[in-house]
Amino acid sequence: MAPKQTKAEKKIAYDAKLCDLMEEYGQILVVNSDNVGSNQLQNIRKGLRGDSVVLMGKNTMMKRSVRMHAEKTGNNAYLNLIPLLVGNVGLIFTKGDLKEVSEEVAKYKVGAPARVGLVAPIDVVVPPGNTGLDPSQTSFFQVLNIPTKINKGTVEIITPVELIRKGDKVGSSEAALLAKLGIRPFSYGLVVLSVYDNGSVFSPEVLDLTEDDLIGKFAAGVSMVTSLSLAISYPTLAAAPHMFVNAYKNVLAVAVETDYSFPEADKVKEYLKDPSKFAVAAVAAPAAASGAPAAAAKEEEKKEEPAEESDDDMGFSLFD
C-alpha cells in the first residue's frame, strides 16, 4: 500500500500538474461548480475525455501555481486567469472547439429539489392543474396564498403562482410544497464563466456569435465610422464616397447661383429655366419604351404573313 501523501507533497504534485496542463493547453474554460456533486463531476470528466481535462482545486492553490508557471517560463499570459479565480470555480483545459466543449458541459445539468435556505437561481412558477393531493393537504396552499379548489376529491390549483423569485431564499413551506408536488425546479451543472484563449480572456457569450452576427456588427461599426467622419469632415475610406457626392452637390449649388458653369451645371440650369422640360423628358421616356415593342410587334407581323400563291405561278389552271 502506497504511503499517504503529506499536505506539502499534495501541493507540490498539484503545482506540477497545473503547470504541465498550462504547458500543453492554450485554451481554458473557467467554470462555476456550485451545487455540483462528485458523481456529476465524474460524468462530465468522462464526457470530455479525449481532448479536455477538468481540474478543480482551491483558488489559492490555483493562483499560486499560475504565478509559479509565469516565473519559471517567463510567460505572463496565464496571469490573466488570476482575477477570474473567485468563488467555487474550476478549470477545463481543452484542445477542442471551445463552443463544442461548452455545449458538451451544459449537457450534464441535473434536476435538483428546492432545499431550505438555497438561493433560487431562477423564478419558480407552480402551474395550474390537479395536484393529486387529498383535501387534508390544503394547509400548505393556504400558507402560501395559492388559490385552490377541491375537484374529484383532490386539490386543484386554479391559476399559475410565482412561488419563489430569482435571488430569494427558499423557505421551509415552499420547499415542502414543491417536494409534495414532485417538482424539482432547479438544475445544476458546471457553468462557463469566462473563456481564456492563448492570452485573451472573454465572455462565453462570444462563443454563441454566428457569422451573421459578426457581419451585422461590422456593418454597424462601418456605419458609425462613416457618420462620425462626415460629422467632423475627416476623410476615411468608408466616408470618402459620401464626401465626394456632397462636395459635388455643393459645387453644383454654387454653379447654379453664379455665372460659373460646367456641362453638368448647364443641364441643371436649363431645367431650372424651363421646368416644363421635366415633364417632356418624363413623357418621352415611357413613349420611347412603349414604341419599341410596338415597332417590334409590327415587324414580326410582317415576317409571319405568308406569301399568297397564284394559279398562274403553277403553270396551269383548274379548268385546263
From Swiss-Prot:
Q: Which Gene3D superfamilies match?
A: 3.30.70.1730, 3.90.105.20
Q: Which domain of life is it from?
A: Eukaryota
Give the residue ranges for region: Disordered. Answer: 291-320
Provide the record's note on post-translational modification.
Phosphorylated.
According to its record, what are the GO cellular component terms?
cytosolic large ribosomal subunit
Which keywords accompany this UniProt record? Phosphoprotein, Ribonucleoprotein, Ribosomal protein
Q: Which residues form a coiled coil?
A: none
Question: Does the keyword Transferase belong to this entry?
Answer: no
- What GO molecular function annotations does the UniProt record carry, in alphabetical order? large ribosomal subunit rRNA binding; structural constituent of ribosome
**Could you tell me which InterPro entries the record lists for this protein?**
Ribosomal_protein_uL10, Ribosomal_uL10, Ribosomal_uL10-like_insert, Ribosomal_uL10-like_insert_sf, Ribosomal_uL10-like_sf, uL10_eukaryotes
Q: Which PANTHER family match?
A: 60S ACIDIC RIBOSOMAL PROTEIN P0, LARGE RIBOSOMAL SUBUNIT PROTEIN UL10
Q: Which family does it belong to?
A: Belongs to the universal ribosomal protein uL10 family.
Q: What does this protein do?
A: Ribosomal protein P0 is the functional equivalent of E.coli protein L10.
Return the protein name.
Large ribosomal subunit protein uL10
